[in-house]
Swiss-Prot record:
Pfam families: Acylphosphatase (PF00708)
Protein name as catalogued: Acylphosphatase
EC number(s) given by UniProt: 3.6.1.7
Active-site positions on this chain: 20, 38
Chemical reaction(s) catalysed: an acyl phosphate + H2O = a carboxylate + phosphate + H(+)
Domain annotation Acylphosphatase-like: ranges: 5-93
Organism: Pyrobaculum islandicum (strain DSM 4184 / JCM 9189 / GEO3)
Length: 95
């Protein structure tokens, strides 16, 4: 199975709705590693996902809807070179 890396920017009503915690739970369930954090604009969540292509794709599909209470307007996905740099999935501080 090919490993991939995706850098996501999820925009809309995605802060204050447990988006980061929910994404972490979904990522761990599918064996995806990386991180997620809020952006200081108040309407963007950023994430980097690494893992098998099908597992990363499942997390991206989930991100298009998000948890209850979220209203996702846009998901930008930038495919990057796989680095294998993560041991787990973390919630990082807001930037």
């Amino acid at each position: 199975m090919e490993n991939v890396r995706a850098h996501l920017y999820i925009k809309g009503k995605v802060q204050g709705v447990f988006f980061r915690q929910s994404m972490k739970e979904i990522a761990v369930r599918y064996g995806v590693r990386g991180w997620v954090r809020n952006r200081s604009d108040g309407r963007t969540v950023e994430a980097v996902l690494e893992g098998p292509r099908d597992a990363v794709a499942k997390v991206i599909e989930w991100a298009k809807v998000g948890p209850p209470g979220a209203r996702v307007e846009e998901v930008e996905v930038d495919w990057e070179e796989y680095k294998g740099e993560f041991q787990d999935f973390r919630i990082l501080p807001t930037v």
